[in-house]
Structure formats: C-alpha cells, structure tokens
Amino acid sequence: MPLKVVFMGTPDFAVPTLAEIVGSGHEVVAVYTRAPAPAGRGMALRPSPVQALAERFGLPVRTPATLRSEEAVEIFRGHDADVAVVVAYGMILPPAILDAPRLGCLNLHASILPRWRGAAPIQRAVMAGDSETGVAVMRMEPGLDTGPVAMLERVAITPEMTAGELHDRLMPLGADLMNRALGALERGGLTFTPQAAEGIVYAHKITNEEARLDWAEPAQRLHDTIRGLSPFPGAFFMADLGRGPERVKVLRASLADGRAEPGTLLDAHGTVACGEGAIRLLRVQPAGKGPMEAGDFLRGRRLEPGARLA
C-alpha cells in the first residue's frame, strides 16, 4: 500500500528525490520548504526549486517560518503521514515533529556517515581530499545527523572533481536510494544500523576566511580547496588589476611544477607558486564578471610573470 509522505526539502539537490517519490506512486500529502527568498538583480521573491516542482505537480506547499510553535506542530500532525522524507530542508526539526509520522522521519544525507555530519558534507569531503563519499538514508533523531543508517551508496571522488560535479553526481543516486528505502519501508523490510562511534567528523559551514587562498600552503591543499568550493562560494585570491585590490574566484585549477615566493605568477599560462609546488589557474571569475579562461583573464588584466597575487 503506498505511503503517505510529507516531503521536506529546499534546494536543487532535493528536487530529484521529490520527483522519484511522486513517480513511484506514494501519496505526497504536503511539501515543506523554505519561504521564497529575494534573488536576481531585481531581488524579486523567488520560490525554492522544491516549491517550483511541487506546484507543477499540484502538491500542497507549506513554508512555515518555524516548526516549534504549537500551531505548526498541530498542522504537521494533521497530515497524518506515515513518514517524512527530509532532504536539505534547511531547518532543525524539533522532537514533536520528528515523532509525528507513524514510521518516523527519513533523511537523505550526502556523506558516508558518521564522516561529515552537518551542513556542508559535499564541500568538506572534496576540500579534505577524500577519495570517496556517498549518500545515506538514516532515521532522524534530535542529534545532528546521529541517527541509524538504513541504506548507503558510495561514490568515488576523482582527483579533479569539483564539489559542483560531485553534487550533480549524488543527486540522482540519492533520489534512487531514498525511493528504494521507501519501498522497503512500505514492505516492512527497512532495517537500521547504528552509526559507528569512531570516525565522526563534522562538516561545518564554509566561512569566508577559509575561502581565501593562502599561497603559502601546499599546492595539493590549495587544489583541494579550489575543487571543494567550486562553483560556490568559490575560493578566491586578491590581485591589483589597476583599480586597487580586487577579488578573483578560482573555479578550476590543476597541479603544476614550479618554485618561487608563494603567490608569484610564474608564467603567462597562470601557474602560481605555492608553499610546496605550484598550481595552474584554468578558470576564474573576477568580481562582477562572468567565468572565463585564466589565460584570457591574465591577458586582459596585463598580469605578467613575476606579479604577486595576494
């Protein structure tokens, strides 16, 4: 018998999972998502990707500012759901919400738990130079991503893969994994295993300070940082482009050979000396501009070999 599902999600990452659930015949009784937010040059209110899809499906959408009020809890209980599916919703679920669905709340998390619990698991895995990550379906508890895991799918992180590319790889895998988990739950065959007590690492939110490239660091670490922060928020350096220091994001780079004072531009191809080794800039985005090839950027800004990048 199809399950009655409350879906809770907000960004692009959650969209394929909602589509899979609808397509598999489960009854989505409500979709919870973050409220429309200002976006674009005109800062007009724009609904979340999940809300846009839910409205195309004709599903009821709720965008509460809080889930902690008595009214919000009663409305949630009124859905009489078998299960809630949570994918990057963006709000903490209080115990009263976690306890409301008959079969609990399932969360799709983008890591091999317990490694990279928290807000930025995809970016942190790439920034750390991990060789693999994955997606996991777990039962939610009051703790941060501490619940027992039902299903796990592993994915290799290739040496040049960016966080954006990994995000796009994990989206359909996660949707399929959650769909299979719901099928097992419907049949009464979904089992859970407690997370290991060892290997717990937290994926804290990315700060602006750690997005700035420190050329004194080893090239491998900088390369991993660039990959992990591409395309958003973007690792960056500062350069004097004729109008004072300006921020330049690095969207793609590769490891290279070279030695000089860290931050020195070594050639016209965009090779920059690091504390150990060097990296070659491949694709950059100056402030207020679109992405461009690093060679075009260097020629246009007249940055010559020997220039220092801060």
UniProtKB/Swiss-Prot annotation:
GO terms for cellular component: cytosol. It is an enzyme of class 2 (transferase). Keywords: Protein biosynthesis, Transferase. It catalyses: L-methionyl-tRNA(fMet) + (6R)-10-formyltetrahydrofolate = N-formyl-L-methionyl-tRNA(fMet) + (6S)-5,6,7,8-tetrahydrofolate + H(+). Disulfide bonds: none annotated. The keyword Cytoplasm does not apply. (6S)-5,6,7,8-tetrahydrofolate binds at residues 111-114. The keyword Nucleotidyltransferase does not apply. One of its GO terms (molecular function) is methionyl-tRNA formyltransferase activity. Its EC number is 2.1.2.9. PANTHER family: METHIONYL-TRNA FORMYLTRANSFERASE, METHIONYL-TRNA FORMYLTRANSFERASE, MITOCHONDRIAL. Belongs to the Fmt family. Attaches a formyl group to the free amino group of methionyl-tRNA(fMet). The formyl group appears to play a dual role in the initiator identity of N-formylmethionyl-tRNA by promoting its recognition by IF2 and preventing the misappropriation of this tRNA by the elongation apparatus. This is Methionyl-tRNA formyltransferase. It comes from Methylobacterium nodulans (strain LMG 21967 / CNCM I-2342 / ORS 2060). The lineage of its organism: Bacteria, Pseudomonadati, Pseudomonadota, Alphaproteobacteria, Hyphomicrobiales.
